[in-house]
């Protein structure tokens, strides 16, 4: 833990093409090894694929993120030698981060031939409440529901 207090939250500039801060964050999450131009090609390529079927791709991405974002998650809490999975509510910034991470991970596991197509297919599925990312959210919610008895261990 840092002794100097928490670092201030850095702001993310909106992306140049759509002017959306959410899309800019999404691009940063897709990025690997600092290759932002590659990440931009992937995200914008996916949005072009979505644009063929749905005229407003930014809204569809937002809807997909809202559908995937978890309301609760479980955190491990050690009490007297036993470790309990305690359900806790997820704060909004973490909700979006988890939603993006799960969408990207699910897209990478898909069978389509290019990453933009994989990401577009996963976003379309998530906007219609199906796909791997939605399955991950349901699994997280199920875990929280199963461990509801330990909710009083919240900190």
Swiss-Prot record:
Part of the 30S ribosomal subunit. Contacts proteins S9 and S11. GO terms for molecular function: mRNA binding; rRNA binding; structural constituent of ribosome; tRNA binding. It comes from Xanthomonas campestris pv. campestris (strain ATCC 33913 / DSM 3586 / NCPPB 528 / LMG 568 / P 25). Coiled coil: none annotated. Belongs to the universal ribosomal protein uS7 family. InterPro entries: Ribosomal_uS7, Ribosomal_uS7_bac/org-type, Ribosomal_uS7_CS, Ribosomal_uS7_dom, Ribosomal_uS7_dom_sf. The keyword Ribonucleoprotein applies. The lineage of its organism: Bacteria, Pseudomonadati, Pseudomonadota, Gammaproteobacteria, Lysobacterales. This is Small ribosomal subunit protein uS7. GO terms for biological process: ribosomal small subunit assembly; translation. NCBIfam families: rpsG_bact. PROSITE patterns: RIBOSOMAL_S7 (PS00052). Gene3D superfamilies: Ribosomal protein S7 domain. Keywords: Ribonucleoprotein, Ribosomal protein, RNA-binding, rRNA-binding, tRNA-binding. The keyword Ribonucleoprotein applies. GO terms for cellular component: cytosolic small ribosomal subunit; ribosome. One of the primary rRNA binding proteins, it binds directly to 16S rRNA where it nucleates assembly of the head domain of the 30S subunit. Is located at the subunit interface close to the decoding center, probably blocks exit of the E-site tRNA.
